[in-house]
């Protein structure tokens, strides 16, 4: 699960508004800021926001897409799947033979809104980005990832989330799609308690599967790549319950953009290498060191005559003003500072290289936009796995300090072919239609006969089991 890397091109640079540019209205939490994307184009979302409810919803067949607001990546993935479900509902030509109710209702829910105690996902995310990061790294890598494994149970639902169980009892969903482990476990518990037979689809939003997913009580895992499937097989997840779909990105990242037109739109030079730094921060803590490294790199930008740096500061006007002062004082002509950007997918597609943190949704969007990456900062937990996966394939460079960042940019400046090589290697992971594929799988399962696997439907409070030797060393 990814808690930290998505605060740059999601809520990271979003202005505080009741709905956001193309966000999803979350039932049961109208008072919260709902902005989820920096993609402000009306073409990127249906006129009716996905998940928005109407008085008739109670009588319509419903698919629930559930996330946890710990960071913004899980929410962004949930929104992408919800938009894909609505697209399939409204355009039968995209269904590929999968049945879909014409009056399908899609609910996008934050599982934390159903807790006995009100939980602040942003504060929870800080545990994974502050001084406790090494502890989190150990727990993420080693908790129930060996031979002793977690299957699922009702504990989460009975102790913390009985309200969601009642919502499921009333709604009787066709299916539940979960982009966070808490959501998945609560969905499994609700199904056990209510005795319903709807399928549960798990969608990890990083490039490895952690140990707390309800492995034996989920109907399908939609994973990013074959390596994740290799992780699930020794955990006794049957092959027919694994689909390699990719990580769901927003609709804007399914589009193809003209690079020259994009540069003209954002006022960027056509004859330079555009390096885009995603430095916006909805939660500032994870980006303190990231921004410090960018600040220290600025004085060396004079060296790279063929490079034009674009820094996105998001909704942080104070940080944007600081960057502009620095560039002016240093006399840097080859830099542009942007605040809130409408059309982030187009901006990324207009760039040759992106400097970013290694969050699952961030790197997925870079892959979809065909933008090679320099991953900046020490990586822990799921971000460490993302770094290892991307660098091992040659799809990204990884640096941890400003000195290494300057060196990497110099290396790219002296060897431009590196960028093209990273782009080629990244194409093996690029799956811009992941959200559509996940939506099709969810609808296919919803239309099929319920599973007759007695073990998957059996009630447990806490269900642990023994697996085979893990496929990957953590």
PLM features: residue spans?
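Active-site and donor-binding regions of nucleotide-sugar-utilizing enzymes
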Residues: 77, 92, 139-236, 241-244
